[in-house]
Amino acid sequence: MKKHLTTFLVILWLYFYRGNGKNQVEQSPQSLIILEGKNCTLQCNYTVSPFSNLRWYKQDTGRGPVSLTIMTFSENTKSNGRYTATLDADTKQSSLHITASQLSDSASYICVVS
């Protein structure tokens, strides 16, 4: 009898909140558990104005954040390997889509708007 091992990925979702009056950045969900090989999408909503750029970072435990994408107001989609970021500047929303997740994707993901 064969044993099948299913690997679960735990994508820690860092809730980032920047609150100074009207400027806020919120991410959801706060954490996500998915099966290896599956796709997932992380969301970022912001009220930052004026808007210069939006960045997605990946931070492995015990390490500093690594930039995945930098998007400006005029960019709608940007890809970096299995990571695809979308930006809708009108609704002030961004998403990070991870395709064919791997164990190495287990990390914190941070959305930064400036």
Curated annotation (Swiss-Prot):
Glycosylated residues (UniProt): 39, 45
Main location (coarse class): membrane
Gene Ontology CC, one term: T cell receptor complex
Keyword terms of this UniProt record: Adaptive immunity, Cell membrane, Disulfide bond, Glycoprotein, Immunity, Immunoglobulin domain, Membrane, Receptor, Signal, T cell receptor
SMART domains: IGv (SM00406)
SUPFAM superfamilies the UniProt entry points to: Immunoglobulin
Statement: the UniProt record of this protein carries the keyword Glycoprotein: yes
Ig-like domain sequence ranges: 23-114
UniProt-listed CDD domains: IgV_TCR_alpha (cd04983)
Gene3D superfamilies given in the database record: Immunoglobulins
Superkingdom per UniProt: Eukaryota
Coiled-coil portions: none
Assembly, per entry: Alpha-beta TR is a heterodimer composed of an alpha and beta chain; disulfide-linked. The alpha-beta TR is associated with the transmembrane signaling CD3 coreceptor proteins to form the TR-CD3 (TcR or TCR). The assembly of alpha-beta TR heterodimers with CD3 occurs in the endoplasmic reticulum where a single alpha-beta TR heterodimer associates with one CD3D-CD3E heterodimer, one CD3G-CD3E heterodimer and one CD247 homodimer forming a stable octameric structure. CD3D-CD3E and CD3G-CD3E heterodimers preferentially associate with TR alpha and TR beta chains, respectively.
UniProt name for this protein: T cell receptor alpha variable 10
Species per Swiss-Prot/TrEMBL record: Homo sapiens (Human)
